[in-house]
Structures are given as C-alpha cells and as structure tokens.
Amino acid sequence: MMTVTKIEPLSKTRYKVYLDGQFAFTLYKGELSRYHIAEESVIEDDIYDSLQQIITKRAKLRAMHLLSDMGRTESQLRTKLKQGGYAEDAVEAAIRYVKSFGYINDVEYARSFIDSRKERKSKKELYAALVQKGVSSEIVEQVFEEADYGEEDSRQAIAVSYTHLTLPTILR
C-alpha cells in the first residue's frame, strides 16, 4: 500500500502523481476518478500494478509514435519520453520494447546520419553532431572506421562548403 502525497496538474487533463513523496506516474483526469485517486488516499498494490501496466503500454505506444515521425537515437527517445512525464521504469520498458523490434539502433542511426551528410560536413562536425544526439563516441568511431571516412572525404566536404560562399558573403 502506498499513500498519494501530491497530485500536480500538468495540463487540463494530465496530472503528475506522487506516492510516498516520490514521483510515480502521470495519469489522465479520468483515470484519477476511475481509480479514486486523491491526495492522502491509499493505493492498494493490485491497483498500483494495474496502473503500471497501463502507463507502460502508453509509454510503448508513445515511443512508437515518436519513431514513426523520424529516426531517433536511444538517448533522444529517452529524453522525449521523460519530457512526456513517464516514470523511469516505463521509459526503460518502452526502450526495451522498441529495441526488441529493431526500431531503435544507434549504430544504424549513425551510419545513416554520416552517409547522408558526409558530402557537406567534415568528420569533426559529424562526430560532434552525433555525440550531441546521444550516440556514444565508441559507436561513432566504429561507424567512421566501417564507412572508411578519410581525409579525402573531409577535404571534399570543406571544398563543397566553400563553393556556396559568394564574394559578398565573404566580405561581410
């Protein structure tokens, strides 16, 4: 049994629920009424387990929706889910779920990112962008080695970037 210590509104319909002083999950207004959740009320273990299942399923669906829009790194997806008000265990379950289907793969993301931009960006720029997106430096190095991205590619990217400059742009 756990005690609801605080219910904090996120929007007109969504609320953050704190159990025993710790953030537990985000619920919709209808779920608060359906499960009779109010501040200082007690939540039985079976209701808590039921809520956890609902929230985990919701996090998985949200992860799938986020990935349908565009490819993301594991770090980016984790951040978006946390920003959406999902608890850590629901976020981890959603990450495991999408990974199990191969919908999220930082190595493939890095390969695609490098292949699509190596004509316009230097190796340093690509490396920095991928690390900023949450891809580990080991994965980035591995993908650069596999792609055989050398100095010639880097020089070509710099040359392409200079061809876009015009005289008035340089003189500004």
Which role fits each region the language model picked out?
Residues 1-165, 172:
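An alpha-helical, amphipathic repeat domain used for nucleic-acid recognition
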